[in-house]
Regions:
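A short alpha-helical cap/connector motif
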Residues: 1-123, 130-149, 156-192
């Protein structure tokens, strides 16, 4: 299947699914198309060959990342806890033809992040359970390469859920931050 057609299908599926589901864990909570476009541009302009995504869902955002890293001969490692979402993501990676550029890790990010290589990622995309971001920060900080970029989704729409952590990171002299009004708000955190 053509990648653009698959992306459009997943956008429609996500909107339809999320409008019918009440429970948060049953929602796909996909990024917006303009967020996907931004991620693609960020990966390519930074030359990010090693990308980490925390929160795969059905793989829609991963497709944007994988399409970009393919051009750079890079790779995306993505983490998802929910088994049903992993099954859908795996299927979508196969259908897209991008599976060779993606490694899907099954499990809890709290357990998996410590197993990943120090300074191993030029770009990390964080779109998961926001209540854990503060606890994950030491590991994310460890994983981010020099001049690496962390992109945090929902930074405007759900700012109240992570404002303390955002303030903490914003005061760290090793990082510079910017809030970008794309999609539901993307918070960019660059290691200096």
């Amino acid at each position: 299947m053509e990648l653009e057609q698959l992306k459009r299908q997943l956008e429609q599926l996500g909107e339809r699914n999320d409008s019918m589901q009440q429970a948060r864990h049953r929602k796909l909570l996909n990024i917006t198309r303009d967020t996907g476009e931004l991620l693609s541009v960020l990966v390519q302009t930074r030359g990010a060959q090693a990308v980490l995504e925390i929160g795969t869902s059905n793989g829609y955002s991963t497709l944007w990342l994988a399409e970009a890293v393919r051009r750079l001969e890079g790779h995306v490692t993505t983490i998802e806890l929910d088994e049903d979402k992993r099954v859908h993501a795996h299927d979508n990676f196969q259908r897209s033809g991008l599976a060779p550029w993606v490694t899907l890790l099954a499990g809890d990010a709290s357990e998996l992040l410590p197993t990943l290589p120090q300074a191993g990622y030029q770009l990390i995309f964080l779109d998961s359970d926001r209540q854990h971001y503060r606890a994950w920060w030491p590991q994310i900080r460890r994983l981010l390469a020099p001049r690496g970029l962390l992109v945090v989704d929902n930074a405007i729409s759900h700012r109240s859920e992570m404002v303390e952590w955002m303030n903490e990171v914003g005061q760290d002299p090793a990082f510079a931050t910017s809030l970008v009004p794309v999609g539901k708000g993307e918070w960019l955190v660059v290691r200096l």
